[in-house]
Structure formats: structure tokens, C-alpha cells
């Protein structure tokens, strides 16, 4: 179908008249829809930014004021030897989010509780892991977060399916390249399998950023932006924990399999 001065001419030759006012209304509606999507995106990712800033301030203050005997304490630092324990928090948060969505009326204090629920495992991470390790994992997670959400928010509406395919293809290629590197190392097969599985889970979590951004852009009304921000924040923290688990997996397997060299 092509358009000629207010007429729409299908390929079969039939002429359909569309008044110019209706065409302008359609353009205005699309523009307003785009503005509304931007408002929702700004509210949602602005809330995520405030959550990250608040948690960073809390963790920095705690680590600065914490006694020196707390760092790498044998009873406190279970992250390196058993990193799976910190995943209880994101799983619990998902359950609580489901309960929040089904509760009537919704309570904003519950959302604040979900956010603060992530402080204890992050405190343990900051106390027990090397600072360089935590910073590098956080930078990698934020880079993946900004890349996937940026593509979803800035790409035109007509390329939604295309950008989904492109993002998933890039993540698949990245996962394949990492697995090839892992298989070429001189580690045990147990370590290779567990590490590859953890990388797969992390890649899936990163791709979820893109899907969450698409949901925020096209489906989230403004009144539910805060709930969407909490969900995106949970994905962000979960991916950070997955990256840290991969980085500490060598120590984890050495502890449980008593291997001198993986």
C-alpha cells in the first residue's frame, strides 16, 4: 500500500480516502505514546538509579565504619566457600514481589523492604571479597545493563523484533566464545561444566535486561513504574551475584572437591 495526498492506494488498485486530520491525529497519538514511554522509562530507571545510589552509600558507610576484625571473618565470610547462599535473597525477593502484586491494597513500604533485603548479602560480599573483584563485577554488570536497556529504549518501535534477535544473537555468540575459552583451559571437566553452566545463567540474566526494558517501554503504565523499577533492580543484583559467583567458583570447587589444581 502506498499513500498519495490523503489517499491510500492498495496494490489491488482500490483507492481509500483518509482525511488529513485523521493522519495528523495518528501522528500526534504516536508522538504522545512515545513521550509516555519515555516518561515511564525515566521514572523506572531513575528509581533504579536512586536505589543503586542509596545502596552504594549504605554499603560504603558500613564498610568504612565496620571493625577491622569483621573483614574476612571465618564465621561471616561464607561467600567464597559457599557462594550459593547469597542466592536465597533474590529468590525470596521474587516470591515477595509475587505476593506484593497479588495483595490488595499495595503497600509502598513492602517495596522498600524488598530493596533493603539485598543489603545483608551485599555487605557480606563487601566484607569478604577483594574490593577489586567486587568493583570489576559491578562494572561488568552495569555495562551489560546499560547496553541492553539502551538498545531497547532508543531503538525505533518498528525494529522491536529485530533488536530482540540481534541482542539474543550477540549473547549467544558471547556465550559460545566464553565456552570455547573455558574448554581450551587445562581445568578439570567438573570445573568446566559448572563454570559453563554459570556463564549460561549469567547470559540469560543479561538478556533479561533487554526484555525488562522493552516491557518498561511498551507495557508499563506510569503508576506501576515503581514496581517495574524494583523488578529491574532485582535483575541487576541477581546478575551481579552471578558474576561474583563465577569469579569465586574456583575457590568454591576447591573447597568441596579438595582439588589441588583445577
Curated annotation (Swiss-Prot):
Signal peptide: none
Superkingdom per UniProt: Viruses
InterPro entries, alphabetized: Bax_inhibitor_1-related
Transmembrane domains' residue ranges: 46-66, 77-97, 108-128, 133-153, 163-183, 186-206, 226-246
UniProt cross-references to Pfam families, sorted A to Z: Bax1-I
GO cellular component: membrane
Primary location group: membrane
Family: Belongs to the cytomegalovirus US12 family.
Annotated protein name in UniProt: Uncharacterized protein HVLF3
Organism: Human cytomegalovirus (strain AD169)
Organism taxonomic ancestry: Viruses, Duplodnaviria, Heunggongvirae, Peploviricota, Herviviricetes
Record gene name: US15
Amino acid at each position: 500500500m502506498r499513500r498519495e495526498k490523503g489517499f491510500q492506494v492498495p496494490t489491488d488498485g482500490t483507492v481509500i480516502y483518509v482525511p488529513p486530520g485523521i493522519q495528523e491525529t495518528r501522528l500526534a497519538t504516536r508522538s504522545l505514546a512515545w513521550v509516555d514511554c519515555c516518561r515511564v522509562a525515566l521514572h523506572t530507571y531513575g528509581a533504579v538509579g536512586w536505589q543503586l545510589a542509596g545502596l552504594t552509600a549504605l554499603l560504603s558507610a558500613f564498610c568504612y565504619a565496620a571493625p577491622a576484625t569483621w573483614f574476612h571473618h571465618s564465621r561471616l565470610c561464607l561467600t567464597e566457600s559457599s557462594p550459593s547462599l547469597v542466592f536465597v535473597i533474590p529468590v525470596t525477593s521474587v516470591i515477595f514481589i509475587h505476593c506484593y502484586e497479588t495483595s490488595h491494597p499495595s503497600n509502598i513500604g513492602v517495596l522498600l523492604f524488598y530493596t533493603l533485603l539485598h543489603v545483608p548479602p551485599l555487605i557480606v560480599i563487601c566484607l569478604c571479597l577483594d574490593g577489586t573483584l567486587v568493583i570489576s563485577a559491578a562494572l561488568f554488570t552495569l555495562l551489560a545493563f546499560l547496553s541492553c536497556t539502551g538498545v531497547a529504549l532508543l531503538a525505533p518501535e518498528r525494529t522491536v523484533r529485530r533488536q530482540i534477535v540481534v541482542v539474543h544473537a550477540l549473547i549467544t555468540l558471547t556465550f559460545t566464545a566464553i565456552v570455547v575459552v573455558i574448554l581450551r583451559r587445562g581445568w578439570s571437566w567438573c570445573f568446566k561444566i559448572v563454570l559453563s553452566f554459570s556463564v549460561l545463567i549469567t547470559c540469560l540474566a543479561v538478556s533479561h535486561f533487554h526484555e525488562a526494558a522493552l516491557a518498561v517501554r511498551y507495557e508499563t503504565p506510569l503508576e506501576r513504574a515503581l514496581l517495574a523499577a524494583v523488578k529491574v533492580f532485582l535483575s541487576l543484583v541477581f546478575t551481579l551475584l552471578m558474576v561474583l559467583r563465577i569469579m569465586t567458583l574456583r575457590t568454591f570447587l576447591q573447597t568441596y572437591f579438595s582439588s589441588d589444581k583445577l
